[in-house]
Amino acid sequence: GIYRSLDAGRSWQLMGLEKTRHIHRIIIDPTDPNTVYVGAIGSPWGTHPERGVYKTTDGGETWEKILFVNDKTGVADMVMDPTNPNKILVAMWEHKRDPWFFKSGGPGSGLYMTHDGGKTWKQLTEKEGLPKGDLGRIGLAIASGKPDIVYALVEAKKNALYKSEDGGFSWKKINDGNDIGNRPFYYSDIFVDPENENRVYSVFTYVNVSEDGGRSFRQLMPAYGVDNGVHPDHHAWWIHPTDGQFMIDGNDGGMNITRDGGKTWRFIGNLPVGQFYHVSVDNEYPYNVYGGMQDNGSWRGPAYVWRAQGIRNSYWQEIAFGDGFDVVPDPDDSRYGYAMSQQGYVRRYDWKTGNDYTVRPTPPDDTTRLRFNWNAAIGQDPFDHQTLYFGSQFVHKSTDKGLTWEVISPDLTTNDPEKQKQSDSGGLTMDATGAENHCTILVIEPSPVEKDMLWVGTDDGRVHYSQNGGQTWTEVTGNIKGLPKGSWIPQIKASGRNKGEALLVANDYRRYNYTPYAWRTRNYGKSWERIVDAGDVASFTLSILEDPENPNLMFLGTDDGLY
């Protein structure tokens, strides 16, 4: 939904539009602060009508939907003419994401323009100079100093940068080279200097700048091989309205500021914006905290210190690179451990020397292709710390800390071939990063009270257990009443007291089902008791934990917060 603050951000009030799920742009009429335009991109996971452009003229008390195409098309970008607040250009984007596939583009995508505050709209097509056929995501930028100059970064059969010199009535393709950007579904952001209509920034993995109105670009910020303190993968950009040398960059590593047009950058280090997938601790005293961060590696730091001034940034150490996920410190010697990254990579590290090496399982034969989830499964055997488990579509077991592996299960997923076409994913522009890998194992949970007892959950809704270290497996999916077929099973927590007892979390939001799901079994999955539903919490479930001393005290992590 959308929130409003009347005290400079100290407090916020919900003003509606909750069902839009995702809002991409908000524009306030500079002549009337009660008139606001909202560009709702909607949920990528499902079709729903609460998307498009909404308008309020009473400060958010009521809303009118003024532009709608269809229930799978939302607003990718929206700009207002700074000299005429009734003139707005909107990029509509048809897209759909499934757990196993992504499609950008379709007949719903297009560019629209209004001159009367949204009462009437004109769709701009190939007649105005835009590309023919289906379009994908479109990024827009208007030159505030000369608002007749408008740029459109268009995903199409051939991605290109288009320019209008008459306020959007006609368009010309000016650049279709690789320097305009990559991965349009993920980026497609373009910005123009308010003081120089020919200085254009394309913001993507790199940041490129044009000084000739987009005809050519040079690299302003390389992604790799430089030490400027700026993380690659850029998603937000701000240019000072009267000083084009002053810019702010928002990227996958945080926020950076330049005062000299991008020659030097200062990292803003006091914003807590890191995204941790998992958190773990070791057995030291004081203990250390470990975690893997989205696109920012895996880290280790003290929970507390016996020093004045507390924990400093310098006390934290990066122990592995990439998209960080689970970190498993060695219970016997926390100098060593395992850190995961995307595509199922796992490394054994030595944080004292900084050395590490890959211990990722390899296929059991030449004909088998392993499928690893973006956030793959790892488990440490609580009875034998030499033993490690790792998940692809199989359970892999190592008894020598990852040096060698054996497969100890059949394919525990549905192995649905229709959900294994990631090489075709992306829509108009192919995009196969591994984020849509499917029919994979999500969780491997060894029991801390029963040797050789393993629980396994998958991303296509299957739950198995083995009581003999993987020699045989029993599926209990059908016993979980109310579990939607094909749901994700991101967590199973085996009881620390009782054999055969476990907690299970499932979610199905990737298919536009935001219902919370959690169950408990006390008899090895023969029956399950549902312990949370929509009447208890506000959003889908992600994790669950039982207090080790008081079994009646439980914690539930949801997309909405902690319960």
Residue ranges and their predicted role:
Residues 1-563:
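Beta-propeller blade termini and top-face loops
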